[in-house]
């Protein structure tokens, strides 16, 4: 046996040290997740957000248009991988220090370094300490395992193998445990208890939701008029967690006087309940990022007009997650500040404690986690405009085809949703022969409100064999949806939806 200063680590092959470090990194990430769950306090959250904000606009556009939801998932996976690598470096540092001292110090150094790095990235002490302990534990247990093997004069290969197996076992235990604990945590936030101030529980909400259920066409597989899986699109992979008791909304910029509103101020105002649909500018033509909900809130103009507004220009909405969007001040006239959704407090993923709703416009300007309304004297680029998008205008008219059912009598039933913003939907037509002939679809009765979608359905005898079904909509102004297809980038998708039916 070698008589070096520290035979345990001197005998350790480099590849084994790296593998142990990577396993320790996995445990550290799991430890962070166990406490933080999928919030900004989770180590991968800020890293994923940083990548999303700093990657070239062309790459972000490719991810949105080509990869869709897969792009967001890959961003998270890459962030987890980078987090693991960062913690692995801390584990390697611990092993390097351990070569020059007694072996237990390696785990301590790895733990301390991991915790310090995590705090610097997340500003969250508790998840960082747990991440450090998890990382250090794997390093410590693997060192102890090999130390026992060396002390008993076990062969080098066996000692190295024991070290690696100890790292695998401890990392697996900590990793699985951390994932289970983190997954079981609720990432929702509850509104503060304010006596008598729960506008989302108003008695008129249940009848409105019941009306929407009644007006839904009941087509199998078709999402109802009030969406049960409302889409979410954000610039970060983790949503901010805001405390409503300390949250405030400010009105700033070129105003006569700046104003600030607390959550309690908002809830004490006269509220309204509105059905409003939203559609993502970056979705595919027949994608599923278009939904509808019953929102509870107050008029944005009631908040900004007391500040004294200029004649005309524009407004910048800023959010707690670093997002910001600019659009004409005129679009704010019918703006709505939502604090409730479908009879519940606004969910965290949809902007708790408050979000903006700008009727008839693409989803990107309906800013979540709203903290500031800045009135501008001249135009500025918003977050997505800086990346080449132009999604601050009115939404394009669309009729989507999401359901193709075969009925018991052999007939085909197709269905979907149609939406044209505040222009409304007057008509949906269906062609079952590739666009040669057209027939009117059945539309759901309109919901109360000016910015809502409608369901449509059409049943027909199939011609036999493969055929093309095409759908198109006419808005409430009498304008037919344009036929020519366009990419989501930069101003949103357009065109008639076509599907092959067999």
Regions found by a protein language model. Give the residues of each.
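Membrane-anchoring hydrophobic segments
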Residues: 1-102
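A short hydrophobic/aromatic micro-motif that marks alpha-helical segments and, especially, helix-coil
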Residues: 70-73, 175, 375
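Structured, non-membrane catalytic/scaffold regions adjacent to prosthetic-group chemistry
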Residues: 84, 184-502
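Alpha-helical membrane-embedded segments
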Residues: 132-145, 170-184
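Juxtamembrane/interface segments at transmembrane-helix termini
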Residues: 145-152, 182-190
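N-terminal secretory signal peptides and thylakoid transit peptides that target proteins
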Residues: 153-173
